[in-house]
């Protein structure tokens, strides 16, 4: 009952709302038992988190993802997501929907990218249950979906329209599509994308900004489902001009073995790559070999401030390394 303890502490401090992420593992391992959510949101699902330490197969994963509706007074679902109709039909609570490509209770359209010197974002209109004009410093269709999930809840609990629009103009998510360094040659950003879907969403969005080259620096976590490595290798081959393969949190595995798994799908798909296992050196290579007009995406860790190798965590923050590299080489 750790969660209940923390909820009580929050209430004692005057907190009225709690926004939390509940993973499929949380439902499987009973971490969120005895909790009724006022609003439960289902964003999307893909074949991930399947392995000895997570879920036995996709059906089990899907089942535990859907358990959120059993513990919610009101459910909200992305109607464009795979299996949305199936989950909507089986939901035991009152449901609302949001979408871009289908008719829903909350719909987004007129989506436009905004690319300014110090701002890479998106604007769109909301219609249906409410009408809003949204602009935010987070680009990509996938971020529109994330915003629509939040907008659905905010509208249903009665937050004024002006407050919602104002909040989105100021929204910032640490380590998500975060531009860290920019000069006349390159733009360098960090993002937490650490599986195939997230990587495809990010890189396809950055492609729409039409950089001369799209360079991605990434690895994969050790002791996690290997399918992530194969999926990210395919995504890199499809969307990146150059992949710099490096360490993430290798944990108990060898970084070179993880990179070999990534290469097993990246190379057959025609992807170009450089292999630099040391993450700092990989970032330095990307920035010191940049060509005019390059966009460099350092992904997989986002806001994380550590690297875990052989059970030891050491301080490592991608954005610090990017800024240190810029200063070191006077970029």
Feature roles, as predicted:
Residues 11-13, 38-188, 263-270:
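Acidic, Mg2+-coordinating active-site environments of NTP-dependent enzymes
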Residues 92, 129, 149-331:
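ATP-dependent carboxylate-amine ligase
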Residues 1, 20-27, 56-60, 169-173, ...:
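Short gly/ser/thr-rich secondary-structure transition/capping motifs
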Residues 10-16, 72, 211, 293:
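Short, high-confidence coil segments that cap the C-terminus of an alpha-helix
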Residues 33-45, 211-217:
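Inter-motif core of Ras-like GTPase G domains
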Residues 15-25, 187-194:
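Switch II (G3) loop of P-loop NTPases
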Residues 1-23, 30:
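Conserved nucleotide-sensing/catalytic segment adjacent to the nucleotide-binding pocket
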Residues 21, 44, 78, 217-219, ...:
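Short beta-strand segments
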